[in-house]
Amino acid sequence: MNRNTSKPFSANEKEIERLLKENRRWKERLTFFKEEITFLNLYLSAEIFQKDVPNLYERLQLFYDDLQNIKLECLDLTTQVHNHRYDIEGILECEDISCEVFYHQEHLKLKQKVQDFAKKFRKFKSEIYSYTGPLLRRTSNEP
Amino acid sequence: MEKKTHNYRYIEWKTPDEMHFSSLQWKSELNFIKDEHRFFEDMLKEYTLPILESQLFSRVKELIEQLNLSRKDLKLLENRVAQHINKLRELLENLDEQREGREYRKEHKEILNDFIHYSRQYKRLKRDIFEVVGKAIKQQKQKRLLA
C-alpha cells in the first residue's frame, strides 16, 4: 500500500526536485543492497560453517541460487530507477495534465516496487541469518 | 559524524494514520537490525581463526565495540519509538488536540531525524564489517588454494 503524504501532485520545479531527490534515495538504497548481495555471495560460499551438518551444502546452494535471482532483480530495478530519472525531468515538458499524472503514477509504482524489493530482501537476509548463524564454525570447539 | 537536522516540512501534512504507519515501519526496521546485530556479533566472535590468521584481529575488536555502541543506541531509539506509538493513542483521546498535535509532530520529526542518522551510521558499520570479514574470507580461500 502506498502511504505517501496525500498532497495532490502538481508539476512545478519544487515538486520535480522532490521526485528527483526520492529517485536519488532509491538509487543509494539499491547500491547498498548490491554491496550486501556481494558480501552474502562471499559468505555463503566460504568454508566457515560447521562440518557434518545434514543437508548443509544443499541449503547453502538454495540460498545461493535465490541470491542470484535477487541480484538480477536488484540490477533490473537499478536500471528502472536510473531511467526513471529522465521521465521525471521530462514531466515539465508535458503538454497536458494526463501526461503529468501518467508519469507521477509511474513514479509511485516504482516507489512501491523498491519498497517491495526491500521487504523481500530483508526477509531473505533474516532466513540466512537464522539458518547459518548457529552453524558458524566455533573455532574453540572445532578443528 | 555531524548530525544534520532537517526540517521535514512534509510532516505537517501527514495524517495521524500516516505518522502511525511510519512509526510502525521504524519499529520493524529496528527489530530487524537487532537480529542483524546478533548475527554480525556471532560472526565476528566465532569466526576467529581466519581472522587471527589474517591479522585483522584488532580491527575486529573495534568492530565488536562499535556493534555494542550501535546496540545501545538502538535500544534508546526503540524505546522512543514505542513511547511515540503509545502517545498517539493517548493523543487521539485528548481534548486539547491542537497543541498536543503540534508537539507530537515535532517529536515525530525529531525521531525521524535520529532514525535517519542512526541508519546512516549503521550502514557505515555494516560496510566496515563486510570489508573486514570479506578480507578474512578471501585470505582463507587463498591459503587453501596454496596449501
What are these language model-derived features?
Chain A
Residues 1-143:
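Charge-rich amphipathic alpha-helical interaction elements
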